[in-house]
Amino acid sequence: MEQARPIRRALLSVSDKTGILEFAKALNERGVALLSTGGTAKLLGDAGLPVTEVSDYTGFPEMMDGRVKTLHPKVHGGILGRRDQDDAIMAQHNIYPIDMVVVNLYPFAATVAKAGCSLADAVENIDIGGPTMVRSAAKNHKDVAIVVKAADYARVIAEMDANGNSLKLATRFDLAIAAFEHTAAYDGMIANYFGTMVPSYGDNKEGDAESRFPRTFNSQFIKKQDMRYGENSHQAAAFYAEEHATPGSVSSAIQLQGKALSYNNIADTDAALECVKEFSEPACVIVKHANPCGVAIGDDLLTAYDRAYQTDPTSAFGGIIAFNRELDGATAAAIVARQFVEVIIAPSVSQEARDVVAAKQNVRLLECGQWTAPAQGFDLKRVNGGLLIQERDFGMVTQGDLKVVSKRQPTEAELKDLLFCWKVAKFVKSNAIVYAKEGQTIGVGAGQMSRVYSAKIAGIKAEDEGLTVAGSVMASDAFFPFRDGIDAAAAAGISCVIQPGGSMRDQEVIDAADEHGMTMVFTNMRHFRH
């Protein structure tokens, strides 16, 4: 068979031993000779498989506590040797061709993620022989198959069975790509880890501002889907995800029905889901163009959805809806009967809800899984020729963090609304103003160049939907540079304001609140969002 290569000898040396015994048995049953090292060789030998230790094959023992195992010409000559072209020199040095290499690498990421991991621990989990064999086999994919993922074991055996114990070039090439991706990610993790130690060059990174970010930033994402287009129809696009995306994210979500997700669908769904995660009560967030246009909590999801929708039914048309509880049939029925929706996402979806939404085949229904702790990692923003990297904004305040700076004190009900409103403001594009009352947004002013106009827009939105502003609270994602935003809020009927404070004119702004008989609370925390 043209470009197919028979598999007669395989070298197996894996850190993650998932499925390796079954794979080795399958290879042995097909007449493949097995070479192996260390723990892998012991596992295979204990299972009764005929296996040759690499040290017996090379005539050179493992040494230096296993640091040197496979770095030998008889190993790499067998992997890198070009069939036909190098046969004579291989025979001269008694080098056997190695047709398949099965390797995955020391668990560096898992090691450095452990509490108390020392530099010495990290160093000992830097694989040397493994990546060298992987790269050698991938380089010589014309003749050699390299397998780095347990998920590929079954398809390798299936193809061998279909092709007389041979693998096609297309398969070997695909496996080689996976191998280079594997070593690239591995080296990137190591570079990131050591890069955070500059300039301390040691275990103790406390107090080093530079240590939060490595000298070079390496990250790897796996393509999840190609898209019809990007943000606009003239832009090509694709969606990439982290290899181990955490549950409770758009990247890990399973699509239960509907059209393929678009670029804008994914961006908006992420915004809605991250916002709804802030609430412990049953909550609903409706997003349009990455901005919450309606957010509410309730005793149940249906109540939360009804109240979120009431904020701005006009903007909710064609929006994204996120929940923090299992989507039930009653809530799904209300959505389908009431509005056109692009995406619905929830931790889980009941069978009744699935059946209801199935009546609208184009609606994208996503089940994201339940989240626990906030996802770690960085926020990344591409700029022309560069990349901005920052810690994710996990900042939030509790009632005990608030500082009342006005003469009037907030009531308990107002304090609850202030904290609710503050959570929403964190996810609104700056300049952000949010009006809320009794756990429901009643007006959102987003993305304006001046804060006072965001305040005016929030009031207009509430008025247009017939919602009562009187007695409501207002959140601002950043400080008020002038009193005009407070005057606009007072004119609309706002009774309490929550904001970071920190302006040169704070006293002027506080005085304005006192003049209007309003409560003002400082958080000492800003939530810009661009």
UniProtKB/Swiss-Prot annotation:
Q: A Gene Ontology molecular-function term?
A: phosphoribosylaminoimidazolecarboxamide formyltransferase activity
Q: Which Pfam families does the protein's record reference?
A: AICARFT_IMPCHas, MGS
Please indicate if the UniProt record lists Protein biosynthesis as a keyword. Answer: no
UniProt-listed Enzyme Commission number(s): 2.1.2.3, 3.5.4.10
Please give the GO cellular component terms listed in this UniProt entry. Answer: cytosol
GO BP field: 'de novo' IMP biosynthetic process
Name of the protein: Bifunctional purine biosynthesis protein PurH
Relay the domain remarks.
The IMP cyclohydrolase activity resides in the N-terminal region.
Tell me which residues make up the MGS-like domain.
Answer: 1-148
User: Which organism does this record belong to?
Assistant: Aeromonas salmonicida (strain A449)
Q: Does the keyword Transferase apply?
A: yes
UniProt record similarity statement: Belongs to the PurH family.
Which N-terminal stretch is annotated as signal sequence? none
Key words, A-Z: Hydrolase, Multifunctional enzyme, Purine biosynthesis, Transferase
Q: In which pathway does it act?
A: Purine metabolism; IMP biosynthesis via de novo pathway; 5-formamido-1-(5-phospho-D-ribosyl)imidazole-4-carboxamide from 5-amino-1-(5-phospho-D-ribosyl)imidazole-4-carboxamide (10-formyl THF route): step 1/1; Purine metabolism; IMP biosynthesis via de novo pathway; IMP from 5-formamido-1-(5-phospho-D-ribosyl)imidazole-4-carboxamide: step 1/1
This enzyme catalyses: (6R)-10-formyltetrahydrofolate + 5-amino-1-(5-phospho-beta-D-ribosyl)imidazole-4-carboxamide = 5-formamido-1-(5-phospho-D-ribosyl)imidazole-4-carboxamide + (6S)-5,6,7,8-tetrahydrofolate; IMP + H2O = 5-formamido-1-(5-phospho-D-ribosyl)imidazole-4-carboxamide
